[in-house]
Amino acid sequence: MKANHIRILLLVTIAIMLISLMGRWEQTFPSNSSQSQTTQTQQDNSHYNSDTPATTNVSTSDAKASLTKTTSFSKYDDAKSVTINTDVFKNLKISLLDGAIISASLEDYSVSLDDKTPMALLTDEQGSEYIAKSTIVINKKPVDVNFESQGIKKENGKQVLTLTGSVDGLEITRTYTFDDAKYNISVSQNIKNTTSEPVSVIIDDSLARDFNPAGDSFSLLNAHSYTFTGVAYSTANDSFRKESFKDISKTNGQPTVINSQGLGWVAFIQHYFVSAWIPQSNDSKIYYKNLNNDVFEAGAYTGISIAPNQSESIDSVLYSGPIIKANLVDLAPNLEKTLDYGMLSFFSEIIFWVMNQIHSLVGNWGLAIILVTCLIKLIFYPLSAKSYRSMAKMRMLQPRVKRLQETYKDDRQVLGKKMMEMYKEEKVNPLSGCLPMLIQIPIFISLYWVLLESVELRQAPFIFWIHDLSMKDPYFVLPILMGISMFLQQKLSPAPADPMQAKIMMFLPVIFTFLFASFPSGLVLYWLTNNVISILQQWIITRHYQATHKK
């Protein structure tokens, strides 16, 4: 295959891989290749020896009433709630009914560049409700608990809210512990059985959200539509798995229960942010469901058996905040995988680490992208230089190529043979010009996901009109400059001998300008910087080669 054919194929491959394949791969095929451990009706006959004697391995039938019940958002009264403010949470409200967290805004993350209001991650706003709750199931029956607040205690940078309530002979004390600088909330429940009979209790920690999957549609011209929205979970049997809301909506209203033993977690993921319940018991079971229209729920339930006049405690952690690896890695095994860079995450994590180090020095993510690009070009300079020298030699051979084409224009087989003989004689590899592009493909894809998924770049400004590197250039200046740079780069490369190839190559800058117009401006900045450096390198090397190899 001719070198120009391969160049065209590689360019098209980049577009296809970015736009068609990579954008949906992680949603279509789970990251973990192991067989799914899910089942819709799972009976458990064995007891797991937990470190906490009070917990019991609850069967799905015991939790059936809770699993088949849809959350009613309307029952929570905003007026009957306790408000908490920390360094990271603003107006976090805990309802006195069931102790549900019905709203929480993130102090450090505004709604948009134009609206500096803290973004509401959890909300009780009608039509877009998203809450975290802990339901109590007594003897297989879910109950509502009307709590009373015992006040908030502040000490050592922490706030502790205590709620007390009673129902069906059980006295319940629930505490919420907030570290002022962290997004994780420790939830501890002490339940005392004041009756004369043993009581079976299930604690169902769950997330519930009103979400329309139809609105989460994929668009070629919206790079952010490639991101994942749905449920993620981790168990002892399945380290990390994702299920999109769109796929869950096709489960015909049946709850899915994951049969697992050992520590795990369950989460709702959206672009840049995650809410996750992390039970502290080895006997918790994970589930997710979509029983009613657009209400999606996911949670972890844990069973405890309480003897008469005895009390038992059970703990869990709720994380609700940005997807930042440093925040998640110590909370639970595999929780940091919610920062999912896709199949090339290994390279993406290296690129982000280097970018983050540079950003800590220069204080601007745009400059960090430019400097990372320069560093990448420096690392691969020996390969690029070899490629550009080969292309310069190919360019000098163009007159001979044209003569061969004129001589053997009626016999393409002989023409191909003669050209290969010429390349061999001149020690030229016609495919070497494709090497820089091959190298760029994994780097391009890795950086693409870094820019798309890293919350650190959300609303990160560059200069002048670029106020958010994670969004497209509002005036399309960078895509146009990138298209011009591609055109100039073509002019330095050997011209295709085939007129059809020449036309295709001529239109590629236009096509890519159109495609990149919807990409994050940070990604376009990388590609533009890469092209400019490549043009300078190629021009200098070509000029030097021609000057030293004149015949």
UniProtKB/Swiss-Prot annotation:
GO-annotated cellular components:
plasma membrane
Q: Does the keyword Transmembrane helix apply?
A: yes
The GO biological-process annotations, alphabetized, read as: protein insertion into membrane; protein transport
The GO terms this record gives for MF are:
membrane insertase activity
Cite the record's Low complexity compositional bias ranges: 30-43
Which InterPro entries does this one have? Answer: Membr_insert_YidC (IPR019998), Membr_insert_YidC_N (IPR028053), YidC/ALB3/OXA1/COX18 (IPR001708), YidC/Oxa/ALB_C (IPR028055), YidC_ALB_C (IPR047196), YidC_periplasmic_sf (IPR038221)
Q: Which UniProt keywords apply?
A: Cell inner membrane, Cell membrane, Chaperone, Membrane, Protein transport, Transmembrane, Transmembrane helix, Transport
Tell me which domain of life the UniProt entry assigns to the organism this sequence originates from. Bacteria
Q: How does it sit in the membrane?
A: Multi-pass membrane protein
Which parts pass through the membrane? 3-23, 361-381, 431-451, 504-524
Compartment annotation: Cell inner membrane
Q: Which CDD domains match?
A: 5TM_YidC_Alb3, EcYidC-like_peri
Q: What does this protein do?
A: Required for the insertion and/or proper folding and/or complex formation of integral membrane proteins into the membrane. Involved in integration of membrane proteins that insert both dependently and independently of the Sec translocase complex, as well as at least some lipoproteins. Aids folding of multispanning membrane proteins.
What is the protein's quaternary organization? Answer: Interacts with the Sec translocase complex via SecD. Specifically interacts with transmembrane segments of nascent integral membrane proteins during membrane integration.
According to its UniProt record, which protein family does this protein belong to? Answer: Belongs to the OXA1/ALB3/YidC family. Type 1 subfamily.
Name under which the protein is recorded: Membrane protein insertase YidC
**Source organism:** Francisella philomiragia subsp. philomiragia (strain ATCC 25017 / CCUG 19701 / FSC 153 / O#319-036)
